[in-house]
A protein has these predicted regions:
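Predominantly soluble domains enriched in secretory-pathway, periplasmic, or organellar proteins
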Residues: 23, 29, 33-414, 419
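Intrinsically disordered, low-complexity polyampholyte segments enriched for Lys and acidic residues
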Residues: 4-6, 22
């Protein structure tokens, strides 16, 4: 058994910046039509020099910052002191050289594709750089001299259609080989560095990530198996000798003498493995508070040249932990503020400079011009002089001041006596991909842009009626970028390291979808809202969320499947998953049948989860419903559901929360993450506007507090719950749906040729989302306005993996 994880040392906490005034229910005036907060904070630069992220967290990265494009995952230093970085996310991938003195990119080589995996060898100012090609199944070799690089050659590990996906690399000079991890083939491949011929392969654990070597053995982090595979290089061919259990989601590896240091992205910690015994000698927690729930996401490591200090990238905390490696124990000496979601680290040869790749850079921003969210978020590299003890103390205080999470946030935000006493039933309704401006931008009393409201009151009268009757939330942001991570954020307040690092490749058509397959890496067992509710002894029913169905004309032809263990016994089997040929009004009828049955039984589930996916739309598929017809159907279904809930005997003790899983399919003049949030409940305030900064995690936190559940992650723990939008005395007046004012049978022209294959619309977000956005815009503004444009700091279109 591994030793007990050690906590953070006592570090004085600076006062945490409060995003909004904390108000109790009793202190809030119930004034109809009044905005609940006079000030509105939105994502972006703040007066103190920090940046407010759409997640509600703040960053102020140390050092100088260099923009490098989407999702940088690799950093290496060259013998001349410059830094090589790859951007490996959505859109064009590239290999770049950064001059650390001038703090700028001075050379860039476009790549067909890239992902994790970068290594270099060389001396006397001559370097060879090896880069994994991800979906190309190739490894690229670059010659680098005098600041210029050129592609010397490349090696194919397998045919282009094979599932290999080269990832982490390790150079084996004794053997004259380079070892390449095959992330999708669960193997390690060996390439002869002289001939570029393949010299065999060794099977390892599930979804291997990266690898390091001490010359006689090769160590491979098995991302999906909680193990490190040990390959013996002293024999020919090499063989896998053992698999060392280290903990959940092992990612980055660093050798330190006779020890192996492993970043455990799923455990908030770092494991220290004694290679002589094969046992975990120590596990150190690097979270910002002891006993913190998941969320720190340590996913990258770098060792100082003297071997005394380990740097740990904490992607979820937007910081780097500075860990002193003592002979007997590790300890966190302090923290350095990074950008948004740090993903790679490197130390200079003299140990004076730390380089940090920030996967999401310095935030997002508005996309009123329709720029796709995959391009809105661009990564960066921070160039940070290594601080002395006093500087590290200042940085540590800064990290704590920037973070909204603390141990105190694990407790309920208000006392049970301060929240509505009878509120005990929650209905959680999840829809697809709309921004605030697309739907509610036409509401005059909110912060909207009516020019972007293509699904305005004429298309969505029920959403408008709900926002008008209860609360208009005009400052709500989704935590996720796309459906791949959006449903994870919606259902558990966090997206895994695996999810965050693979969805940009999936959405660039460079990797097959596997994020709802029950894969523990993407869908960690026991981590979801329904799991927590079931453990608490609550009654939970799921309608469609995280399920799959086939197209068909009847329920029997659409068997509902789920690979998520916790959903198998609580999912309604005749409720379709993502089948857009099924009207959401049909889903509303099926749900209404269940409500009628519960009413007859005199009981109602504690937690009901409902997926209404049809506002995703089918774009301009010929002879299929138009985007506005599908959104109108979705809106009518929502109105019918809220009406039926309001007629139930459970209504006086019920709250329904309605949100989008992400906001990727439209523009917004405030931020690409701003989206639609609706609340229907007798306890919701009437005719109000709430401009409090809320997130997906805020909704989760509110649900948890209603149901008596602990926070699932650091993000929902830190989030501001929606209590400002609730009142003490209920108004149980029923809600009557509004009939659709848009023809639900409106079809796209039969002659139109969509650029999206029909098969790509059979699963959520399988389609080219940029193209879908373009078609949705053109369906509403045919020839009268320019469609949203693709923008990025690099020129590039989506590429199909070959």
């Amino acid at each position: 058994m591994a030793p007990k994880a050690k906590g953070m040392p006592a570090v004085p906490r600076a006062p945490i910046f409060r995003l909004m005034l904390k108000r109790s229910l009793l202190a809030l005036p119930a004034i109809a039509g009044a905005a609940l907060l006079a000030t509105r904070l939105v994502p972006g630069s703040l007066p103190d020099g920090s940046t407010l992220l759409p997640s509600g967290w703040r960053i102020r990265p140390a050092g100088r910052v260099v923009p490098v494009g989407t999702l940088p995952l690799n950093l290496v230093t060259l013998s001349d002191g410059s830094v090589i970085v790859t951007n490996d996310g959505y859109g064009q991938n590239s290999l770049m050289r950064i001059d650390p003195v001038r703090a700028r990119v001075v050379w860039r080589v476009p790549l067909p594709a890239a992902w994790l995996g970068l290594a270099r060898t060389g001396r006397d100012w001559r370097d060879t750089v090896w880069a994994s090609g991800g979906p190309t199944n190739r490894v690229y070799r670059f010659a680098w001299q005098g600041g210029a690089a050129w592609l010397r050659d490349s090696m194919a590990l397998a045919d282009s259609g094979a599932k290999v996906y080269p990832a982490g690399l390790a150079l084996l000079p004794r053997q004259g080989l380079v070892a390449v991890v095959g992330n999708l083939s669960d193997s390690v491949y060996f390439i002869d560095t002289a001939t570029l011929e393949r010299r065999g392969a060794v099977a390892v654990g599930h979804r291997p990530y990266t690898t390091v070597t001490d010359g006689s053995s090769l160590y491979v982090s098995d991302w999906g198996d909680s193990t490190v595979s040990v390959i013996d290089l002293s024999v020919s061919p090499p063989v896998r000798r053992s698999a060392l259990f280290v903990g959940p989601h092992p990612s980055a590896l660093v050798l330190h003498g006779s020890e192996l240091l492993v970043a455990l992205a799923g455990a908030n910690g770092v494991a220290r493995v004694d290679l002589a015994t094969g046992h975990v000698r120590e596990q150190l927690s690097v979270s910002l508070a002891p006993n913190a729930p998941p969320g720190s996401d340590p996913n990258a490591l770098a060792l100082s040249p003297d071997g005394h200090t380990l740097y740990v990238a904490m992607a979820g905390s937007n910081a780097v932990a500075v860990v002193r490696l003592g002979a007997k124990a590790m300890r966190v000496a302090g923290l350095i503020p990074a950008g948004w979601y740090p993903t790679a680290l490197a130390a200079s040869a003299d140990g004076r400079t730390l380089y940090v790749a920030n996967g999401k850079g310095n935030g997002s921003g508005a996309n009123a011009d329709g720029t796709y969210i995959g391009n809105v978020i661009a990564g960066s590299v921070s160039i940070i002089p290594v601080p002395d003890s006093a500087g590290l103390r200042r940085y540590t205080s800064q990290v704590y001041a920037l973070s909204p999470f603390s141990n105190a946030r694990l407790r309920p935000t208000i006392r049970p006596s301060e929240r509505p006493p009878e509120l005990k039933h929650v209905v959680y309704i999840i829809r697809e991909n709309r921004t605030y401006d697309q739907v509610l931008g036409d509401v005059a009393r909110g912060n909207g842009d009516a020019r972007l409201a293509i699904f305005d009151n004429g298309v969505t009268p029920n959403a408008h009626a709900i926002a008008r009757r209860w609360v208009l939330f005009d400052n709500f942001y989704v935590n996720g970028e796309v459906s791949a991570d959006g449903h994870e954020w919606t259902d558990r307040g966090l997206a895994s390291d695996y999810n965050e690092k693979t969805w940009p490749q999936i959405y660039s058509n460079r990797r097959a979808w596997d994020l709802t397959s029950g894969e523990d890496l993407a869908n960690p067992g026991g981590a979801y809202l329904w799991d927590a509710a079931l453990r608490h002894g609550l009654w939970v029913v799921n309608f469609g969320e995280m399920t799959e169905s086939d197209e068909g004309d009847s329920a029997a032809a659409r068997p509902v499947r789920t690979n998520i263990p916790g959903l198998k016994d609580i999912t309604v089997t005749n409720y379709p998953g993502f089948v857009l040929s099924v009207a959401d009004t049909t889903r509303a009828r099926l749900f209404g049948d269940s409500v009628a049955s519960w009413d007859l039984q005199g009981r109602f589930p504690d937690l009901t989860i409902l997926w209404l996916p049809r506002d995703h739309t089918l774009g301009r598929q010929a002879s299929r419903p138009t985007p506005r017809a599908m959104v109108a159907d979705n809106d009518l279904a929502l109105g019918l559901i809220v009406e039926r809930l309001s007629e139930s005997p459970a209504w006086p003790s019920l709250a329904a929360f309605v949100l989008e899983d992400d906001a990727q399919n439209g523009p917004d003049h405030v931020d690409a993450h701003r989206s639609v949030l609706l609340v229907a409940s007798p306890y919701a305030r009437r005719d109000a506007v709430d401009s409090t900064f809320y997130t997906t995690a805020s909704v989760l936190r509110t649900i948890e507090e209603i149901l008596g559940l602990a926070p699932l992650s650091q993000y929902d723990a830190a989030a501001t719950p929606l209590w400002s939008a609730f009142m003490w005395r209920p108004d149980s007046t029923t809600f009557s749906h509004l009939p659709s004012t848009w023809p639900l049978t409106e079809l796209n022209p039969s002659a139109f040729r969509s650029r999206i294959p029909v098969s790509d619309l059979a699963e959520a977000d399988e389609a080219d989302e940029m193209e879908l956005n373009r078609e949705i815009w053109e369906s509403v503004h045919p020839g009268s306005a320019p469609p949203p444009v693709r923008q990025s700091w690099v020129i590039g279109e989506r590429r199909t993996a070959r």
